[in-house]
Amino acid sequence: MGDIRTFVFAIEDTETTQGLCKTIGRSSSFDQNSLCKPYNLYFDEPELSRQHAVLCIKTPIPKIEGVPSIEQLRICIRDLNNKTGTVNLVSDGPNDEIDLKNGDAFGLIAIDNHPFRDNHHLAAKLIFRIELEYFDEAREIVKCTITNVTFGKNNTVSSFPIHSATSTEDSDSSWYGLSEASTQTEVADECHETNTILTRGGRFSILSLRKRGSKQDQKICSNFDRKIHETSSFEEEIEVCTDTDTTEEKEEEEEKEEGDDEEGEIELEIIRVKRIKGRTKIKKTLTCFSKNKKIITPQHSNSMWLLLIVILIFDRLLSN
């Protein structure tokens, strides 16, 4: 599935001469009012015109007694492009003004015999389904959902972007009381009313949408993050270790002893043997010690003994 656009409106706003109208067109980054947002009908499609078509929802006058108001709503798509900009997918009627029912689909950007797969052909580059449902039946507030179903039947992901549910863009309430909560583009599991507002179009309810994430998806993400963490730790360990040919050496400890003051600084390369998965690793670090401390290693100790022996021999020779 592709984009999901959602907005709410009051049925009394459809009882005017023109009804409820919403522009369909190409999004533009230069105009804040025509940016691609989850509560409008502007799309990132270069073949669309700036004002490609218009969605009209209207209640016929006079109203029919005994019939629910939502069932009397007339849905119409009018072409503003005059270049086969809209496509009638539900009947053989004209393409420039398409009458729809709740749940019907319509097309944008007509194409001739465009092959898709399995001998199927697309009549339009973009196909949308429109659905109306009560959000608050007592107050006659309706929720309109328009879904991109261009490749839905063929299990092919649409190429159009899906808005993030954590969008930080300011909500535009100029479209008949649209609330910020209704800008969520993903399908919500819960929807309830939190407040009621009044606009120039009438009274409207503020939507509050809640989405429960899939436990399976959360589990997959958790396992993936854990694998990444383990891989990163292993790579860091590889960088500081070098393989050796021995497999049974034990970890050696550095022996540090304090001695007399000595001028200058001593640079000493400390070798740490570390066993990893049955193989011995050696970690090398270059350490710089101050002149106030003296570290004696086995090699240094042997040198001192040799020096002491040489001094004793030299002293014996002098005494003779």
From Swiss-Prot:
It holds the Pfam family FHA. PROSITE patterns: FHA_DOMAIN. It comes from the Eukaryota. Coiled coil: none annotated. Residues 242-264 are annotated as: Disordered. InterPro entries: FHA_dom (IPR000253), SMAD_FHA_dom_sf (IPR008984). Residues 22-86 form the FHA domain. This is Uncharacterized protein YGL081W. It comes from Saccharomyces cerevisiae (strain ATCC 204508 / S288c) (Baker's yeast).
